[in-house]
Amino acid sequence: MKPSVPSLLPSASRGLRALGVAALSLALNAAHALGAPLQSAGTLSFVDANTLVVADWRGSRLHAITLPPAAPGTSAYFNLKNVSAAIAQSLHTQPDRLRFEDMAVRPGSELAYITLSVDSGHGVPAPALVSVDTAGHVGVVDLKRVPHESAVIGDAPSADKHFWRDQPEATYTVTDMAYRDGKLYVAGLSNASFASTLRVYDFPFNGAATAASVEMYHPVHNQLETRAPIRKMLIADLNGEPTLVAAFTCSPLVTIPLRELKDGAHIAAKTIAEFGWGSAPVGMVMFDAGQGPMVLLTHSHKSADLMSVADIADAAGKPGVTTPIKWPAEPTLGLKSTYVPLAGLAHIANQDANLLAALRRNEASGAMELVSMRKGLFLRLSDFINEYDFADFKYGPKDPWRAAHGMLRTDEGYADLAPPKE
């Protein structure tokens, strides 16, 4: 058993840490570039309907791309079972040359924007940005010509450091972004010894930026951690205060009031939940499907966690989790969530008021799919074969599932298989 976690770090360590964070904040403020070329396209986030911020880990920059206006979209399902083939054709390459980096839905448009790395077979992969509509039409954004402004990411991780031999540490320079009231909040890594970093940029970019390092208590590992970055985050109003809600690998959930994000600060995040080991967050969205504001956290290797903002606020008002889990019988601690069967997603985003959009791999073919799911139901009926799917099955009178099955089968492109209405 590991020793108990100390409540305070040694003063010498805090001094070194403060120097490192101060140097990082100076580097962030040192440069502001207009229209720097994109060397990679990774994490992305919409600031508004016409402005998309793309993180460029190779170039150590953020790029705010101005998109031409888009016509308002009509709510419809994505039912694209091989979006990788359509994207590859538009980029004049093969599907196995594509690496899908991130996905976001343009507000009000029903258009999914996807960042990719395209491997030509020689040299550094090229960045790409495409849009996809619900009919499967792919639009390619010309990254060399599209209007954009750029901001430097100071003290990015070194390009020559790797995880597991071949994963550049610098790919985690930006892991997620969130916008609120003229500020862009950027999670990721720096090259400081306390590597987990939250950078805050004035937006539109004007050269002003701050940086704070982040530590959190990890109940699975039973230790304070200062290196592992935030993987997914969003901003919610908790108990009347704008607060960052953030998830880490393996899988603590923490809260950080935005007022604590001061330049050069070292933030002790409050751990409010432990959702279990052996997985990494891949998506976090907030929505109201008729039962009040909810947060859905999806993971790489386990079921998603659904929780109300009210419950998150209640947990944030308490002291927080400071003790380890009891492995393996009690893998969770703190805030309780509802398990939702959404394992295996690569990316998820709010599509509109009623739908979620998701990228996922087809288990049999390996093709990337772009699909929609209804908020509140969190499934695609056509993923499963069960009693209802046999040709001789008959719904009983007033069967509560008849209407839901009819709606979902129609949504997913199987209107001919929908049960007749009563």
Model-derived segments and their meaning:
Residues M1-G15:
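N-terminal secretory signal peptides that target proteins for export/translocation
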Residues G15-N29:
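Bacterial N-terminal signal peptides
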Residues A33-E422:
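Sequence/structural signature of beta-propeller domains
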